[in-house]
Amino acid sequence: GRATFILYIMQSFSISYIIFMLYKISNIMFDNEDTNYLVVILSGLCFPLIFYVAFVYGLLPGMFLTLLAYYYFIKYTKHKKWYMLVISAISINVAILFIGNNLIHMLAIFSAAVIYLIRVKDKKVIAFMVSCLFLMSASKSLIYNYYEVKSQKSIADGVPKITWIAMGMQEGDREAGWWNRFNYDIMPEEDYDTNRITEISKDSIKQRAEVFKKNPRYAVDFYQRKYENQFLEPTFQSLLVTAPQRNFDNETKLEKVKDFFIKQIYFDETHHVLTFIMKVFQVFVYVFSVVFAVNVYKKKKEILTIIPVAFIGGTLFHMIWEAKSRYVFPYFVFLIPLAAYGLIIVRNKITEYRKNKEEKNEKGNI
């Protein structure tokens, strides 16, 4: 219907703004035109990002707002305008309202802010961090209070967070640590008693920790599978969560033509080709992000630490939490500017090597 169409348009705008902000972040961090152009090209080749247009959720707007927060914090370190910190603080807090896991990105910004504070002694940065924490607490309370007043009912605490950690240590329906209905099953069984559910979750964590202790090979295998099925899954569930859930029988001729392409993308030969392309792209981004990290770790620039710290923090968090490859997708997309710069570094090294070799050959011929 019309509402769905409008949501898809909003999703499309989110993707456009994500690519734009990746470009802006690349420009402000590296000030290199070749890197900037490469970021735009790579973003367009990130097929999971395109497929997520059909997944109406807080993922894409949360990614855009996180990048906006990154950008204005980095810009503040260069231009020292207080309003930039205000935009950054508001953006990251709205991003957290969309997806709670975006708190990791706030902490990544804080890590860079602390380094910057030690180096520059800028009190505005302290105010920025305090404001972020205040906004995070106040916005949540404001939303809860609003709905309690409107509904005339108190909002329950919901599923205890520890249940997601317990589930992250169990074998899942899909793979190690993935969703297995653990928390949803025990909630009605324990009559929604959060204290009892918390105790059961703690017991489950202790039991699984004991299993891992007695079977170290299994523990390594479990967390290896959990890592691979999140960070090395090339589609990041983009084809799974956007796959059509309808019956393809009794179609008109026009629907058959349209659905031929849908079937190819999601179920047939083209699906395997797309998955392979996404895998190549994923390997490319990871490899050249490592090249970036190796070449710039000695540079004492706090702005270069935000994205790597967020990626490391996200990795640690999602190895503890319930697993899904779509959870880690934002961290991967945010690596694109680093990978682009890593490729430029390699290109420059090759160019320099060839130039030096030619100069040596010329000297040898004289």
Explain the meaning of each model-derived region.
Residues 2-11, 225-307:
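Membrane-interface anchor segments at the N-terminal boundary of transmembrane helices
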Residues 22-45, 303-307:
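Transmembrane-helix signature of polytopic, membrane-embedded enzymes
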Residues 84-99, 131-139, 315-316:
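Membrane-interface alpha helices of multi-pass inner-membrane proteins
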Residues 34, 40, 75-93, 123-128:
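Short hydrophobic alpha-helices at membrane interfaces in multi-pass membrane enzymes
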Residues 9-30, 65-68, 287-292:
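Transmembrane-helix motifs of polytopic, lipid-linked glycan transferases
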Residues 6-14, 38-68, 73, 82, ...:
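Multi-pass, polyprenyl lipid-linked donor-dependent membrane glycosyltransferases
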Residues 147-254:
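Membrane-proximal stem/loop segments at transmembrane-domain junctions that anchor or position
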Residues 100-116, 127-128, 339, 343:
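Transmembrane-embedded, aromatic-rich helix segments that form part
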